[in-house]
Swiss-Prot record:
InterPro entries reported for this sequence: Ribo_uL30_ferredoxin-like_sf, Ribosomal_uL30_bac-type, Ribosomal_uL30_ferredoxin-like
UniProtKB keywords: Ribonucleoprotein, Ribosomal protein
Keyword hit for Magnesium: no
HAMAP family: Ribosomal_uL30_B (MF_01371_B)
Organism from which the protein derives: Clostridioides difficile (strain 630)
Assembly and interaction partners: Part of the 50S ribosomal subunit.
Name of this protein: Large ribosomal subunit protein uL30
Name of a matching Pfam family: Ribosomal_L30
Length: 61
């Protein structure tokens, strides 16, 4: 299964509480932090909710 590299490029200051929770659920706390997650429907849904704050790249295995 492919993986996604997710980077927080914008701050969560000024976003809604639900967006902040989504970013935290993805494992991101600080700007410029990078995490690697499995590419599945749940992760894609969370990314879609806060796509304006993130930079996402696919990692082929």
């Amino acid at each position: 299964m492919a993986k996604l590299q997710i980077k927080l490029v914008r701050s969560v200051i000024g976003t809604t509480p639900n967006q902040k929770k989504n970013v935290e659920a993805l494992g991101l706390r600080k700007r410029e932090q990078v995490v690697v997650k499995e590419d599945n429907a749940q992760t894609r849904g969370m990314i879609n909710k806060v796509s304006h704050l993130l930079e996402v790249t696919e990692i082929a295995e």
